A protein has these predicted regions:
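Non-catalytic interaction-recognition regions
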Residues: 1-262
Length: 262
């Protein structure tokens, strides 16, 4: 390791060297930095940063064999497909079920990991992964698809929003509690991104998105668009379109593929 870091410095002269390695290796990097100090390379020692992460437990079978990634994904697909078929609200063709199930399986694995502190250890499980009203990947995907559906049902109003060069001047948002909470949360997206980058903690963004999805659910229930006066409907749709934009970009940022239909 000592020879390797010296060689890297010779080749790249980087500003820093970041090692994303299991937290059990913390002592290893402490010793590496000490060795560099001993050979009077404190400058290089200061460049080394160990970013530890916790281990995922519960991936061993009853026979003691660690499950392969494709086995975990396949198991998630089976559970997701069963959930989709039993759901009374999800309306997709049979031909779409397998692709949707694969998406939900992958989304669950990603969110299950990234919603926790990077350094924490946890037991992996699909328990509650496909339960409604939980802080899980299903929540993100369902709320995104619902916002897409809302935009499609109000296509003419969406065209007006797209054509309006300066909608914030022409429209006034209602200042009700649901609107205030959702707007305030949307305003905090940049802060969540910066904090996640600064602390190297993906959970900052993931938790933000789960909170956003919950706020969207509450807002949709109380801020109707269909059947409302034109200006009110337009302002509400603008709010939901902004929420979908942030939700979509945030989901893609953590590695999810947002579903447009569920």
């Amino acid at each position: 390791e000592l020879a390797s870091i010296l060689r890297r410095e010779e080749l790249y002269a980087a500003d820093s060297y970041v090692f994303v390695v299991d937290r059990a290796q913390s002592r290893h990097f402490e010793l590496l930095k000490n060795l560099l100090s001993i050979i009077e390379r404190d400058d290089l020692s200061a460049k080394i940063h160990h970013i530890p992460f916790g281990r995922v437990k519960g991936l061993s079978t009853r026979k003691g064999r660690t499950e392969a990634v494709d086995e975990i994904i396949d198991r998630g697909c089976e559970l997701a497909a069963d959930f989709v078929r039993r759901s009374k609200t999800i309306k997709i063709d049979e031909s779409q079920i397998q692709d949707t199930a694969l998406n939900l399986s992958l989304s669950t694995i990603i969110v299950n990991d990234l919603k926790r502190s990077r350094n924490s250890e946890y037991i992996f499980s699909f328990n509650d992964a496909f339960h409604l009203n939980q802080s899980n990947a299903l929540l993100l995907q369902m709320k995104h698809s619902r916002l897409v559906s809302l935009e499609k049902r109000n296509e003419e109003l969406m065209h007006e929003l797209d054509a309006e060069k300066d909608p914030e001047v022409a429209l006034e948002l209602e200042l009700g509690e649901e609107t205030r909470r959702l707007v305030a949360h949307l305003w905090q997206f940049d802060e969540a991104l910066f904090s996640s980058w600064q602390k190297m903690e993906p959970c900052r963004v993931t938790v933000y998105l789960l909170q956003l999805a919950n706020l969207v659910g509450s807002a949709i229930a109380s801020l109707r668009v269909m059947g409302e006066p034109h200006d009110r409907a337009l302002s509400r749709l603008l709010l939901f379109a902004a929420a979908r934009g942030v939700l979509k970009e945030g989901m893609k940022l953590i590695g999810l593929e947002p579903l447009d239909q569920m």
